[in-house]
Amino acid sequence: MGQCYDVKLKLKFRDGEKDELRTVKAMQKYIKDHDGKGVNFGLDEWKKEGNGLSTLKDMLRVFFAGWNCWDFEMTQGRKWLHVRNGFDASYGWESIMLDIFDVISPFLEDGSELWIYPDSDYDHLIVKEGKCVTVH
């Protein structure tokens, strides 16, 4: 049994492509440090879906989507990258999403945000002065 999530991200990188690459590397390291150690990222399933671990889109799908995602959307606006997705995952996956947003916060522009709407309640995090701040 799992939980349904609706996730929204609004991202901008502090130093453009350099910080986008740093973000990808930080997410790769998180996977290396945690996969199989209480966390199952389902890398074999992602590989079957044609999703690797080398691009920002790949990494955002691994952390903020599921193989059975409903409508993964990633669009670049004039200033912000917007990601939206609904998916099913374990109840513990919420903590993974919160952790990784904290990990990548130093590379994000102030005002970058994460909203997680699980079955009940919600989480809202924002980057202020390069740090992850919990709003709700």
Residues of each region from the PLM?
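Charged interaction segments
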Residues: 52-136
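Short, extreme N-terminal segment that most often corresponds to the first beta-strand
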Residues: 1-41
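Intrinsic-disorder-associated interaction segments
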Residues: 2, 16-20, 49-53, 93, ...
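Short, well-structured hydrophobic secondary-structure segments
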Residues: 33-65
